[in-house]
A protein has these predicted regions:
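Conserved N-terminal helical subregion
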Residues: 2-10, 63-204
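Residues at the starts of beta-strands that form the adenosine-phosphate
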Residues: 9, 32, 329
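Conserved mid-domain beta->alpha element of the FAD-binding
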Residues: 15-24, 28, 172-173, 205, ...
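Conserved Rossmann-like nucleotide-cofactor binding loop
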Residues: 18, 41, 178
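Glycine-rich FAD pyrophosphate-binding loop
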Residues: 27-55
Length: 463
């Protein structure tokens, strides 16, 4: 069995966000890194524009966990100018009325809209600039031979489509929710794969900039816009060019579902009925709806994440989650930081490194998977209820009174690096306290704050 000290090179499968960031971490540790990526180089202009792959959002929400990992490798200074801060959720009701619900209780508690492509380009460039990272594009991994440490792949442009192979010392799969490395690990170990489809899908749409040259926004740019409609919702995140990327989340089947929207007339009717204020904002609604793929939503959990001293998976390859807490990318970036910490002792065996990483991360990735599912209900439905706003206001008040003991769960997840499992545990206690305090209150001034202080001391006193 080998150690990190006697392993000069690491092979990564997948040069997306997690893979490119992990390559930087590993290069900084002194490793030579080879990245195998099925796509062609996204930084090069292609002869014809290819449609975005289903399941790959145009823009993402960057929060404190992701920022912390990016700061560790020194790329945040270059990224800040490309980010758009979002201070809260801008709710659009069915009458077109707007209401902003701040994310946090402090001015700096914001999340950021970031371009997936722009961030990937930044990370790929940073990885190559280390001088230790080689990226091989157009190579689709199709299997792993653990006996002789070979990765099998198909090379783009090979007219014969013959399987080729490359040797590896240590293999890490950062190849997303359909991971070939994960499949190989589970086949070799007889492991477990749990795929939990949500029963809802999503479609990306566009709200173009207000002016032809771009740069002018049709709505408030420093907010994440939500049209909550009970069983489904529409959201929109701002882009640097003045446009918004809107995402429609709908059930896959049913009266109001993707299955039912088979004609432009049906799409128009749904939007006129439930999202009327967006009609003037989306001149290409029909074109976008039928031109863009419908994305699939599911939670993926697997066990184990590694095989002996050979291979490991992380990010979506190990624990894909639904997007409703904006934490898929952030959790993957936190994975990169976590495996880097596990590598601080170069004399430990690789299988020990992998085991420690999984022991540390699995409870936390399970927790954020659960919280992401819960947040979908909040975003599409609960957020409309008066009691939600009362509990939100009360949670901020209690945070002011007990800043070290009472931190809203959303804030723990988005603005801190408190482990996800701990945020979930503390959040459950806090939710019980909020329920008790608001059970007979219609407004904040009717809440018994002295009782709140006692409950927090009793239940969160040692937290």
């Amino acid at each position: 069995m080998r150690t990190p000290r006697d392993t000069p090179e690491i092979t990564l499968v997948g040069a997306g966000l997690a893979g490119s960031l992990l390559a930087i971490f590993l290069a900084r540790r002194g490793y030579r890194v080879t990245l195998l990526e099925r796509r062609l180089d996204p930084r090069k202009k292609m002869p014809t524009a290819a449609p975005a792959s289903a399941g790959r959002s145009i823009n993402l929400a960057l929060a404190n966990r992701g920022i912390s990992a990016l700061e560790e490798v020194g790329v945040m200074e270059s990224l800040w100018p490309a980010l758009i801060p979002m201070a809260g959720r801008m709710l659009h009701d069915e009458e077109g009325r707007l209401r902003l619900i701040p994310y946090g209780n402090k001015p700096h508690e914001v999340i950021y809209s970031v371009s997936r492509a722009g961030l990937n380009t930044l990370l790929l460039n940073a990885a190559e600039s280390t001088g230790r990272v080689s990226i091989r594009f157009g190579e689709t991994v199709c299997g792993v031979d653990f006996a002789d440490r070979r990765v099998r792949f198909l090379a783009d442009g090979d007219p014969e489509r013959q399987t080729q192979a490359t040797l590896y010392d240590v293999l890490i799969g950062t190849d997303g929710s359909a991971s070939a490395v994960r499949a190989a690990i589970l086949e070799r170990t007889g492991g477990r794969l749990d795929e939990e489809p949500l029963g809802h899908g999503y479609k990306e749409l566009t709200i173009p900039a207000a002016n032809e040259g771009g740069g002018q926004f049709r709505m408030e740019k420093n907010a994440l816009h939500i049209w909550p409609r009970g069983e489904y919702m529409l959201i929109a995140l701002p882009n640097a060019d003045g446009s918004f990327t809107a995402t429609l989340f709908l059930p896959n089947q049913g009266e109001e579902s993707f299955q039912a929207l088979t004609t432009p007339e049906a799409v128009d009717a749904l939007f006129e009925r439930r999202f009327a204020d967006t009609i003037p904002l989306m001149p290409r609604l029909g074109e976008d709806f039928f031109g863009n793929p419908t994305g699939h939503l599911e939670t993926i959990r697997c066990e184990p994440w590694s095989f002996e001293d050979h291979a490991l998976v992380l990010g979506d390859a190990a624990h894909a989650i639904v997007p409703f807490h904006g934490q898929g990318m952030n959790a993957a970036f936190e994975d990169c930081s976590a495996i880097d910490r596990c590598l601080r002792d170069p004399d430990r065996l690789w299988n020990e490194v992998f085991a420690e990483f999984e022991r540390r991360r699995r409870p936390n990735t399970d927790a954020i998977a659960d919280m992401a599912l819960e947040n979908y209900i909040e975003m599409r439905s609960t957020v409309r209820e008066p009691k939600f706003q009362l509990k939100k206001d009360l949670s901020f008040r209690l945070e002011e009174r007990h800043p070290r003991r009472f931190i809203p769960r959303y804030s723990m997840v988005m603005f801190h690096t408190i482990p996800y499992a701990e945020a979930k545990r503390r959040g459950a206690i806090q939710e019980e306290i909020l329920d008790e305090l608001t059970s007979r209150a219609a407004s904040l001034d009717q809440v018994d704050l002295a009782r709140a202080d006692r409950l927090i001391a009793e239940r969160l006193g040692t937290t």
